[in-house]
Structure formats: structure tokens, C-alpha cells
């Protein structure tokens, strides 16, 4: 993997990073909404807010958010890397770094603090972008 940034199609890298961050954010909200809806039906009414807040800040929900961030980063990194013929791994890695910056900004804006779980999300976003680029690079090498 060479670090020649002139071969990267930057528009697709930015689009891939935005797709990765938005996908992670929307899927996390969908999981939280689905959980609240199920609990609302089980309790036959509006669930207590304290119970929902306690569930959403619990460790399993945070881990689900990190996994969803990884999935979004892989998709965004692969999307950015598919357009780069010369260096798909670098395009995926840069898309992952940009997605990590967006995830960091969203987490800091939502929670107001940067904690260990935010650091884990950022690391997973960078690694997910790199994996997406590697998958796209492997696909382009086998198709030649």
C-alpha cells in the first residue's frame, strides 16, 4: 500500500465517509427506537423514561453501537475504495479516518464527553474503513 494521495478519488472518499457515519447513526437510532417500541408494547403503554435511559447507556447497547459503526465503516470504506483503481486500501483507510472524525463529532455532540467507548468507536471506524478498502482491493485484483 503506497501513500500516494493523488490517486484517490476524493469525492467518493468523502461520500463514503458520510455514508458510513450516517449509516452508523441511523442504524443505532433504529435499534434504540425498536427497543423502546417493544418495551412500550410489553408494558402496554409508555415505558418509564428512566428505564429507557438506563437501558440505552448500558454496556450491551454501547457494544451494539460499536458493531453498527464497524458495519457502516466497512460499507463506506468499500464504497470509496471501489472507485479507486490504483490504491483502494488507502481510499478505504482515508474514508475510515474521515468517518471516525464524524463519529467522534457526533458522539461528543450527543454525550458532551469523550470516553473509552467513543475511543473504541473511532478505532473501529478506522479499522472498518481499512477492511472495506481491502475487500474492494481484493475484489478488483481477482477480477483482472
Identify the residue ranges that each predicted region occupies:
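Juxtamembrane/disordered regions of integral membrane proteins
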Residues: 1-144
